[in-house]
């Protein structure tokens, strides 16, 4: 009977033992490619920007979606390779947050931009993500394998999300996409508040 009384204490003691902390890059144990993919999937700011870009491109049609799907991974890969060689870039979380908020505003207001401008926005956002992620990977001694995981995951997310939006022509469906854009902006405002308080 007394042994059962010790079991909860033993379990609590084992649960309290700290494990290794990972500051930024997720170590999945599956290799650098999947570490990079998980890094992107677990970075809410990066995910929201990619989602907003995909929604914007999808609202503008097939040509704009194809332009974004081409420009984003190209810029992300090239800027990431440059970022791997740079010294540590200062924390620019506020710039990344403002960038995805801008994309969310464009979605929420259903701004009609030509495919060339969509491609340019995708290229600029991809460059920003590439420099920031490449520099982060360099500080973690992660290399091109992790960068490729990030690039291919971003490519697939934008490809699938924009492809889901392109065929939506019903008024209510387009409003739903625009509401999602407004939520991206709302989350960005929350993140800016956290950044201002130093919580992120």
Label for each model-derived stretch:
Residues 2-200:
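Membrane metalloprotein/metal-transporter helix-bundle signature
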């Amino acid at each position: 009977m007394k042994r059962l009384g010790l079991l909860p204490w033993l379990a609590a003691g084992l649960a309290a033992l700290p494990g290794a902390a990972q500051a930024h890059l997720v170590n999945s144990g599956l290799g650098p490619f999947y570490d990079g993919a998980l890094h992107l999937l677990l970075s809410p700011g990066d995910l929201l920007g990619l989602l907003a870009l995909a929604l914007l491109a999808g609202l503008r049609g097939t040509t704009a979606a194809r332009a974004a799907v081409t420009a984003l991974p190209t810029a992300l890969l090239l800027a990431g390779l440059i970022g791997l060689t740079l010294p540590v870039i200062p924390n620019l979380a506020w710039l990344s947050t403002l960038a995805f908020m801008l994309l969310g505003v464009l979605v929420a207001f259903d701004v009609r931009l030509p495919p060339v401008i969509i491609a340019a926005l995708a290229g600029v956002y991809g460059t920003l993500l590439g420099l920031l992620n490449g520099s982060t990977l360099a500080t973690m001694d992660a290399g091109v394998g992790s960068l490729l995981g990030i690039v291919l995951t971003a490519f697939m997310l934008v490809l699938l999300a924009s492809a889901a939006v392109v065929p939506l022509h019903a008024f209510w469906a387009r409003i739903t996409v625009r509401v999602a854009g407004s939520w991206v902006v709302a989350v960005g405002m929350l993140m800016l508040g956290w950044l201002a308080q130093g919580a992120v």
